[in-house]
């Protein structure tokens, strides 16, 4: 396991904090400059300066790494893994690939891949090896995949965070779709032309990390979350009252007055509803 505790005799605030030991997992190399772009801070504000996402702001400066989620620009060309690197913009690690034609790209790093390994992408059937990318139609049942496309050539959208994957269950009765079970428990159909990459996303211990103190959250750009009952009545439906007061409504509310907790918010008229067989709670769609 790559988790280790932070030991400090002078600071009790980080008594339970844990970190991932990157020295065991990553290569000691700097990011590829040609694949870095400036990432502007928005602090949860839109172009009018209004807060559209609460609890954002004040993070450490970052550079964005250009990730190849599509994997079809360099089909049928072998690529070698040159380094496995940390990415501050996502929970998983990223791998730097050097293609035979000299092109360099970053991809999401599958768990277990090593420097010197070769990966391949194609629009036809190829070997089922770690990091290989191909259409779902050519991947056998039971295989764990990640970086799955929702639309053909649209780039991977599903199963991209640390430790995530989907399992291929088989083909549907029409032959147009492949059925996958996502890590959430949802069972869903994908067009068989959609691509996926073989393997599980790296950094499996990410969910075991204990932040331990407020400063680490602020370093990541996460601001405090204030309870609605601690606010004034003009700031939140739960606000106001003398001392600690109850909600005073028939149900808890969001800051905008809508019902909160246990309310279904999905629009059932979405086209993708027809592709969901069972939701993550196991309910038939």
From Swiss-Prot:
Compositionally biased region (Basic residues): 256-272
GO BP terms, alphabetized: cytoplasmic translation
Gene3D superfamilies membership: 2.30.30.30, Nucleic acid-binding proteins, Ribosomal protein L2, domain 3
Region (Disordered), start-end ranges: 215-285
UniProt KW keywords: Ribonucleoprotein, Ribosomal protein, RNA-binding, rRNA-binding
MF-aspect GO terms: RNA binding; rRNA binding; structural constituent of ribosome; transferase activity
One Pfam family in the UniProt entry: Ribosomal_L2
InterPro entries: NA-bd_OB-fold (IPR012340), Rib_uL2_dom2 (IPR014722), Ribosomal_uL2 (IPR002171), Ribosomal_uL2_bac/org-type (IPR005880), Ribosomal_uL2_C (IPR022669), Ribosomal_uL2_CS (IPR022671), Ribosomal_uL2_dom3 (IPR014726), Ribosomal_uL2_RNA-bd_dom (IPR022666)
PROSITE patterns from the UniProt entry: RIBOSOMAL_L2 (PS00467)
Gene Ontology cellular-component terms listed: large ribosomal subunit
Subunit and interaction comment: Part of the 50S ribosomal subunit. Forms a bridge to the 30S subunit in the 70S ribosome.
Entry function: One of the primary rRNA binding proteins. Required for association of the 30S and 50S subunits to form the 70S ribosome, for tRNA binding and peptide bond formation. It has been suggested to have peptidyltransferase activity; this is somewhat controversial. Makes several contacts with the 16S rRNA in the 70S ribosome.
Family to which this protein belongs: Belongs to the universal ribosomal protein uL2 family.
PANTHER family: LARGE RIBOSOMAL SUBUNIT PROTEIN UL2M, RIBOSOMAL PROTEIN L2
The protein, known as: Large ribosomal subunit protein uL2
Species of origin: Mycoplasma genitalium (strain ATCC 33530 / DSM 19775 / NCTC 10195 / G37) (Mycoplasmoides genitalium)
Upper taxonomic lineage: Bacteria, Bacillati, Mycoplasmatota, Mycoplasmoidales, Mycoplasmoidaceae
Gene it is expressed from: rplB
